[in-house]
A protein has these predicted regions:
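Charge-rich, low-complexity N-terminal segments
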Residues: 64-65
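Glycine-rich beta-strand-turn "strand-cap" elements at beta-sheet edges
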Residues: 58-61, 136-149
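A short glycine-rich, hydrophobically flanked beta-strand micro-motif that places a catalytic Asp/Glu
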Residues: 53-57
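Basic, often amphipathic N-terminal segments
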Residues: 1-52, 75-134, 149-155
Length: 155
């Protein structure tokens, strides 16, 4: 999907910042955290089965952040709530948009699309949707550097 967006001259998450992004759905974004404590807390909740998602729409956050909207099960929402609960219990500071009840499960497309580019992004992806995805692994990712620390199990 990122290729389709980039082919239309719109920067996708692939070419954003450090260029090490991979397609993903985030349970949480932490503004401050202690990695060892967060890793241990997530390990303590045990592993879950892979998650099947269906992306069937394009969404828009402020400042031109376009994304694919995922239809999710109540189990997936419960997992996100559990992840937030255990990581914030370590003292980690959660980004306000990832609070349970506010969180919108999504996969980012273009992080800085202009108003003129929004219909271009939508046209690039609408004929491909729905897009099915399987989440079968998880990691802690430092989005500033792109450093990825895989987790042993999918929370």
């Amino acid at each position: 999907m990122w290729d389709r967006v980039e082919e239309q001259g719109v920067g996708s998450l692939r070419s954003h910042t450090h260029g090490r992004h991979v397609p993903h759905v985030s349970y949480a974004v932490l503004r401050r955290w202690e990695q060892a404590a967060v890793t241990d807390a997530l390990a303590a909740i045990g592993g879950g089965d892979p998650v099947e998602l269906s992306f069937d729409g394009v969404g828009l956050f402020r400042r031109g952040r376009t994304w694919l909207l995922a239809g999710v099960s109540s189990d997936f929402v419960t997992r996100q709530q559990r992840v937030v609960e255990v990581v914030t219990a370590t003292g980690a500071e959660l980004h306000k948009h990832y609070r349970p009840g506010i969180w919108l499960p999504h996969c980012s497309l273009a992080p800085r699309a202009t108003l003129v580019q929004l219909p271009v992004v939508a046209a690039a992806v609408m004929d491909v949707l729905p897009l099915r995805g399987r989440l079968d692994r998880a990691a802690l990712v430092n989005s500033a550097t792109g450093e990825i620390s895989p987790l042993a199990e999918l929370p």
